[in-house]
Amino acid sequence: MTRRGKWLLAFGVTSTLIAAACAGAVFWLDRDADRTEANCSSQVQAFEQTVQVSRKWTEKEIPGIGDYLDIHWLGKPASDPCSRAPGPTDWYYQGFVRLRPQDATALRAAKEWKPQAPEQIWPDLMPYAPANPQWLRTSIDTLYHGAIHLDPGTGTLFFSLVDG
């Protein structure tokens, strides 16, 4: 075999090994991505089904909310947050907040309200809804967009918001 033939043979073998290694790496990474995506999906599903009580919501997100007594809320993604596509995922949020009496009074006075019930309340939140509410509605446009509803009789605030 000539010197040139040996060089071509070595180059061919090396190229084949590199191509095989790359194909194996791509397969391995794709397999791990599927596992990560499945883990992400199960975490999102668990989050969606768990009524949250964390004090995530403040004056910054819902002006006039004050130092509320308690809160129960849910978040649901508008699209697949586990997708490998670039870009953020918008989230929908709903929740009930029991306001302090002085905060409920101040909030009612600070905004223009109209009588209107919420269009939809997610079933998992229904246990936290007041009995026989007299809902008043107004819009907010902060980091979150949507509507808030106030039942002045109980000082309960219901929010239905989307970020993004």
Each model region followed by its residue ranges:
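Short, internal acidic amphipathic alpha-helical interface segments
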Residues: 132-139
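Short, exposed beta-strand-loop hairpins at the edges of beta-sheets
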Residues: 139-153, 158-162
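Mature extracytoplasmic domains of secretory-pathway proteins
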Residues: 63-132
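N-terminal export/targeting and maturation segments
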Residues: 22-90
